[in-house]
Amino acid sequence: TIFHVAAAMGGAPADIFLNTVVTTKNLCEAIARTAPSRGNKPPLFVLVSSFGVYGVADLPRGTVVDEGTPLENKPARRDPYSQGKLRQEKLCWEYHDKGIIRLAVARPGVIYGPRGGAFSARVGLNLFGVFLHLGGRNTLPLTYVDNCAEAIALLGDRPEAAGQVYNVVDDDLVDADDYLRRYKQRVTPLRSVSLPYPVTMLMSHAVERYHRASKGQLPAVFTPYKTKTTWKGNRFSNEKLKAIGWRPIVTTEQGLERTFEHLKARAS
């Protein structure tokens, strides 16, 4: 079994493409070259993908995101990371279809835990020294790092996972309001401003107009499409992963407690 967890998390678009897509192609080509020595049995190839591959911008608010949710069909409107993960996953399916690998895809939501970051963009963004709280009551697709690792390992141990996709999110998920409130209580009284979704959409339209008028000099931090993708609000299912035997080994309450403990120690 091969576990492919590497990808560029940030940087220039060219760097993300190189370190996510090109490296994956090189790996798959190396597997193809070893095929004669393995006989006819292709290896089980577990790819760690991302919720970023889903195209949720045009779905109604509150739609359940599961493995049947359509993939993004307007990748140019998304961030470079999501574009890279989408291309990476499609590339792996091409090698699966050629019989070079037997692909099983894990699509984690927001992986969190000690030594990770404090906030996903789904909660909000830190701009000009103020945290803009944009997530409101939206459910966060959290998966604690230990639970995510268990899911990935499980796929590598399940031959029936080949040709399948599995969302990785935990049980008893909290919303962005709850997460931010707990952070302020447990870590630091962060200065924040809450923006309702309609206000964020108005800002997004304004930023997009100024971005075009400035011929790209003003970064398009917000666009209406990105805003709908990130902050409109969805629900999330882990039923398919549970059907093959996965269960969270760390509850969300425990995971948040451990994470905030570490963040507090790091801040001090």
Predicted stretch roles:
Residues N26-P80:
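Conserved Rossmann-fold NAD(P)-dependent oxidoreductase catalytic core, especially the SDR/UDP-sugar
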Residues H96-N147, L154, Y183:
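NAD(P)-dependent short-chain dehydrogenase/reductase
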Residues D58-I111, L132-L134:
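Catalytic helix-loop patch of NAD(P)-dependent Rossmann-fold dehydrogenases
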Residues G113, L134-N138, Y166-L173, K184-R186, ...:
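Glycine-rich Rossmann NAD(P)(H)-binding loop
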Residues F236-A243, R247-S268:
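Amphipathic terminal alpha-helices
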Residues T1-N26, G55-V56:
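NAD(P)H-binding glycine-rich loop region in Rossmannoid oxidoreductase-like domains
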Residues L154-V221, E257-F260, R266-S268:
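Mid/C-terminal beta-alpha module of Rossmann-like enzyme folds, strongest
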